[in-house]
Curated annotation (Swiss-Prot):
Homotrimer. The subunits circularize to form a toroid; DNA passes through its center. Replication factor C (RFC) is required to load the toroid on the DNA. Belongs to the PCNA family. InterPro entries: DNA_clamp_sf (IPR046938), Pr_cel_nuc_antig (IPR000730), Pr_cel_nuc_antig_C (IPR022649), Pr_cel_nuc_antig_CS (IPR022659), Pr_cel_nuc_antig_N (IPR022648). Gene3D superfamilies: 3.70.10.10. The keyword DNA-binding applies. One of its GO terms (biological process) is leading strand elongation. Sliding clamp subunit that acts as a moving platform for DNA processing. Responsible for tethering the catalytic subunit of DNA polymerase and other proteins to DNA during high-speed replication. HAMAP family: DNApol_clamp_arch. Keywords: DNA replication, DNA-binding. This is DNA polymerase sliding clamp. It comes from Methanococcus aeolicus (strain ATCC BAA-1280 / DSM 17508 / OCM 812 / Nankai-3). GO terms for molecular function: DNA binding; DNA polymerase processivity factor activity.
Amino acid sequence: MFKAVMNAKNFKKIIDSISNLVDEICFEVDELGIKANAMDPSHVALISVNIPKESFDEYVSDTHDIGVDLEALKKIMNRAKPNEKLMLELDMEKNKLDIILKNEGTRKFSISLYDVSSSNVKVPEIGYPNEVMIKAGTIVESLKDAELVNDHVSLKITEDGKFIIYSKGDINTNETVLDRDNESIIELKISESSKSTYNLAYLKDITKATSSEDILHIHLGTDMPVKIEYIIGDTKLIYLLAPRIES
């Protein structure tokens, strides 16, 4: 038994946030909600999503593993209208997930379930020296600037309280410098200076589905995986991206 009802717009944003990095995923559902952990195919990035039952208007579930093709699910959610209600139901007899959209009428899609085993991927417990709380729109625009120069970007923290997004090409550079007085910075927690370099395309994928006013929690340390967290309603998303170790 699995049945869940929520606003279609919110679920679409969750699926967009996941499908930018992985093609298929195993949702672990139980009486507490839906969760999933997955690595991207290159094992460079990890994503963790937790959708508690409080996120739903209605929620009833036993324990199941539901493996889905995210590309197929994303295409369906792209057809959803903002004011529609979404109902998810597990059809165990047909081994399908029913996706029902309701507003003035009812539209029903059914997708076959994948034999995707429950993931053993865990989010590692890492102690970070620095944390930046920042509006997502500022990060998205800064990454667009950095992309003009290189396909990698460095995230720096200075001891005097600055967060720097920096890229360097063969002849050109780009730098965005933000401090505590910047209106997009909610909070800076700094214990030490740090610098790490990351694949820019992955950072763009991680932030692609965010809204400009979403608050990102970015955890940083020198040559450490960057940890990025944000909330969609009651849903928590966590990303880890491995650094590019420079010689």
